[in-house]
Curated annotation (Swiss-Prot):
Record pathway: Glycolipid biosynthesis; lipid IV(A) biosynthesis; lipid IV(A) from (3R)-3-hydroxytetradecanoyl-[acyl-carrier-protein] and UDP-N-acetyl-alpha-D-glucosamine: step 6/6
Cellular component terms per the entry's GO annotation: plasma membrane
Similarity field: Belongs to the LpxK family.
Chain positions recorded as ATP binding sites: S54, V55, G56, G57, T58, G59, K60, T61
Gene Ontology MF terms: ATP binding; tetraacyldisaccharide 4'-kinase activity
Domain of life assignment: Bacteria
Keyword set, alphabetical order: ATP-binding, Kinase, Lipid A biosynthesis, Lipid biosynthesis, Lipid metabolism, Nucleotide-binding, Transferase
Recorded catalytic activity of this chain's protein: a lipid A disaccharide + ATP = a lipid IVA + ADP + H(+)
Protein name in UniProt: Tetraacyldisaccharide 4'-kinase
Length: 321
């Protein structure tokens, strides 16, 4: 898997974006071809699909965690399906406590704390496992652009700062698909990390299905210490902003590619950087789960989703799903 950082031209067009545009047109054509040839299957339970239109972190995992807690509180049985990014997974697997991030993906390890999780890279492979578990609801994390299965309820997650970047498809821009079609079809749209009352113009036609959401810390961290932050996630800037808003003194930071698999040498380098800054290492939960076997002493910031219209979410989820 090719892992890229989020380049500046994905947010603001420059000559590089325009030079890559012909490749984006090929990407668009292949996407249309794939969708036109696909014969979507019906999965053996109602499907809630959580996805986004662009590359990079938009808060999907936190939305899935929120949904899992919501369904559990209603005694609704569910299974989470995750895409196993950054793993060496060969076939669909039901995650158990002993699985590592390298085996099933960092998101799978985290989500397994909230309920039954199937990690897969091929959506069709989950059917036998779903039949064994017999859930009422299947929460699919990502796969929004996958045309090979029917979706009963879709949630599109949008980062309030990046929105849809420069408006170009991969690789000239961050888009997996142009947003209008996805937003029109969505049952709900989450505008994540939004602390502003003003709705971005591109989202004003969808105000009736728009939910403002914030990523907020859910654990206590000593604010008297110095911290050196690092992450290998899709939107590291939001993580660093969350740390500062939480009141931590961040003396430095280092960014790794999304879903990065850390080596012992990386850990040693990070400890060296922290020592230079007279600081303690702090990272995300997605990164922290990858260090289980490396005997580390790294602080982890846990986060959760806070939304402004929980009643709207409850009404739509339980009315349709």
């Amino acid at each position: 898997m090719i892992k890229l950082l989020y380049p500046e031209f994905w947010q603001k067009r420059n000559i590089i974006a325009y030079l890559l545009l012909p490749i984006s047109l090929i990407y668009q054509f292949l996407g249309y071809l794939r969708a036109s040839l696909a014969r979507p299957i019906m999965l053996p339970a109602k499907v809630i699909c959580v996805g986004n239109c662009s590359v990079g972190g938009t808060g999907k995992t936190q939305i899935v965690m929120y949904l899992a807690k919501l369904l559990k509180a209603r005694n609704v049985s569910f299974v989470i399906v995750t895409k196993a990014y950054g793993s060496n997974l060969k076939s669909a697997t039901t995650i158990h406590q002993g699985h590592t991030a390298l085996e099933v993906g960092d998101e799978g390890v985290i989500l397994a704390k909230y309920g039954a999780v199937i990690a897969t890279k091929n959506i069709k492979e989950i059917v036998p496992l779903i039949n064994e578990l017999k859930p009422d609801i299947i929460i699919v994390d990502d796969f929004l652009q996958n045309p090979y299965f029917h979706k009963d309820f879709t949630i599109v997650s949008v980062d309030s700062q990046r929105l849809f970047g420069n408006g170009f498809l991969i690789p000239a821009g961050p888009l997996r698909q142009y947003p209008n079609k996805a937003l029109d079809a969505a049952d709900l749209i989450f505008l994540v990390s939004s602390h502003q009352d003003k709705i971005p113009q591109i989202l004003t036609p969808y105000v009736n299905k728009l939910i403002n959401a914030q990523i907020v810390p859910s654990n206590n961290i000593d604010k008297t210490k110095n911290y050196f932050a690092f992450s290998g996630i899709g939107n590291p800037e939001r993580f660093f902003a969350t740390l500062k808003n939480y009141g931590l003194n961040i003396t430095g930071y280092k960014i790794f590619p999304d879903h990065y698999n850390y080596l012992q040498a990386d850990l040693e380098n990070l400890y060296s950087l922290a020592k230079e800054h007279n600081a303690i290492l702090v990272t995300t939960r997605k990164d922290h789960v990858k260090f289980n076997d490396l005997n580390n002493n790294i602080v982890c910031l846990d986060v959760e989703l806070s939304i402004n219209h929980p009643d709207l979410l409850n009404e739509k989820i339980f009315k349709k799903a």
